[in-house]
Amino acid sequence: MAMSERTTGTRDEHYDVISVLYHALQGADTCGTYLQDAEQAGDQELAQFFREVQGTYRQLGDRSKTLLRQRLR
């Protein structure tokens, strides 16, 4: 049995990339909400932190899309 099959119940590596993409996009969206909360509270340090985290999630999402696109050709 392949390692990914034991971990996720499927041998499809595309599922794993799609899952990372989903969670990255969800994280970026959630950080957007937290960013708005911090800005409304006037906490610029926290707002900057959420901007950075959101940017990281977006980078992960972009990388996931690239990897998935390459594998679906």
Where are these regions (language model features)?
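Amphipathic alpha-helical hairpins
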Residues: 2-73
